[in-house]
C-alpha cells in the first residue's frame, strides 16, 4: 500500500480558522482578514487602515469597551510597520473577559492610520508613544506630538533601520 503524503500544501497550511469575533464581523459585512492566533490563543484580526474606524466602532458596539493596549512594532528594515490594538469585553462579574487583537499593517514610507482616541480615550498617550517611537501618524488625534523624546529629536528611535546620531564615534582606548 502506498504511503499517503501527510504534509499540507502551502495553501492548506495558510488557511486560518476564523474565530468568533471574525465570524461576527463577517456576518455584519466588515472586511478584514483572520490571522493565526497568538501563543495564548487570542484571536488576531488584520484590517486595512481606511477600515479601522468602522471596524473598531463595531467592536465597541459588540461590547469591546476597553482598550487594554495600543502599540506598534517594526517588521524590519524596508518592511512594514504595524499598529495594534488589544481589546477586551469588560463587565461586572466577568472573570475571564473576551479578548481580540486588531492589527493594521502600514507602509514605512507613509505610515498613516486613523486615531481610535474618539472610541477609546485610553488611546491618547499610547498613540502618542507609537508616533514618537515609530513615526506612525494617527490622523484625528487631538494632541499628536512627541511624548518621550525631545520635541526637536530627529527620526524614530525604535525603527529597526534607525541609526543613533553620534553613537558610532571613535572612542579613545585606555
Curated annotation (Swiss-Prot):
NCBIfam families for the chain: PRK12494.1 (NF009141)
Key word Lipid biosynthesis present: no
Q: For this protein, what reaction is catalysed?
A: a plastoquinone + NADH + (n+1) H(+)(in) = a plastoquinol + NAD(+) + n H(+)(out); a plastoquinone + NADPH + (n+1) H(+)(in) = a plastoquinol + NADP(+) + n H(+)(out)
Q: Name one GO biological process term.
A: photosynthesis, light reaction
Q: Where is the signal peptide?
A: none
| Location in the cell | Cellular thylakoid membrane
Q: Which Pfam families match?
A: Complex1_30kDa
Protein's name in the database:
NAD(P)H-quinone oxidoreductase subunit J
Q: Which family does it belong to?
A: Belongs to the complex I 30 kDa subunit family.
Q: What is its EC number?
A: 7.1.1.-
Q: Which organism is it from?
A: Picosynechococcus sp. (strain ATCC 27264 / PCC 7002 / PR-6) (Agmenellum quadruplicatum)
The record's PANTHER family line, in alphabetical order, gives: NADH DEHYDROGENASE [UBIQUINONE] IRON-SULFUR PROTEIN 3, MITOCHONDRIAL, NADH DEHYDROGENASE UBIQUINONE IRON-SULFUR PROTEIN 3
- EC class of this enzyme? translocase
Q: How does it sit in the membrane?
A: Peripheral membrane protein
NADP as a keyword of this entry, yes or no, is: yes
Its function, per the record, reads: NDH-1 shuttles electrons from an unknown electron donor, via FMN and iron-sulfur (Fe-S) centers, to quinones in the respiratory and/or the photosynthetic chain. The immediate electron acceptor for the enzyme in this species is believed to be plastoquinone. Couples the redox reaction to proton translocation, and thus conserves the redox energy in a proton gradient. Cyanobacterial NDH-1 also plays a role in inorganic carbon-concentration.
Q: Name one GO molecular function term.
A: quinone binding
Q: Self-association or partners: how does it assemble? A: NDH-1 can be composed of about 15 different subunits; different subcomplexes with different compositions have been identified which probably have different functions.
Q: Which GO terms describe its cellular component?
A: plasma membrane-derived thylakoid membrane
Q: Which UniProt keywords apply?
A: Membrane, NAD, NADP, Plastoquinone, Quinone, Thylakoid, Translocase, Transport
Amino acid at each position: 500500500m502506498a504511503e499517503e503524503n501527510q504534509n499540507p500544501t502551502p495553501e492548506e497550511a495558510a488557511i486560518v480558522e476564523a474565530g468568533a469575533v471574525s465570524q461576527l464581523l463577517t456576518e455584519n459585512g466588515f472586511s478584514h482578514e483572520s490571522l493565526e492566533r497568538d501563543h495564548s490563543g487570542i484571536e488576531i484580526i488584520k484590517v486595512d487602515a481606511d477600515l479601522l474606524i468602522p471596524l473598531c466602532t463595531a467592536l465597541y458596539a459588540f461590547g469591546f469597551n476597553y482598550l487594554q493596549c495600543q502599540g506598534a512594532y517594526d517588521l524590519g528594515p524596508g518592511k512594514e510597520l504595524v499598529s495594534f490594538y488589544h481589546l477586551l469585553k469588560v463587565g461586572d462579574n466577568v472573570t475571564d473577559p473576551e479578548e481580540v487583537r486588531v492589527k493594521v499593517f502600514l507602509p514605512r514610507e507613509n505610515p498613516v492610520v486613523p486615531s481610535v482616541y474618539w472610541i477609546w480615550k485610553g488611546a491618547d498617550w499610547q498613540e502618542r508613544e507609537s508616533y514618537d517611537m515609530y513615526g506612525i501618524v494617527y490622523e484625528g488625534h487631538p494632541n499628536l506630538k512627541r511624548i518621550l523624546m525631545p520635541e526637536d529629536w530627529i527620526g524614530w528611535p525604535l525603527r529597526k533601520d534607525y541609526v543613533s546620531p553620534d553613537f558610532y564615534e571613535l572612542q579613545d582606548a585606555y
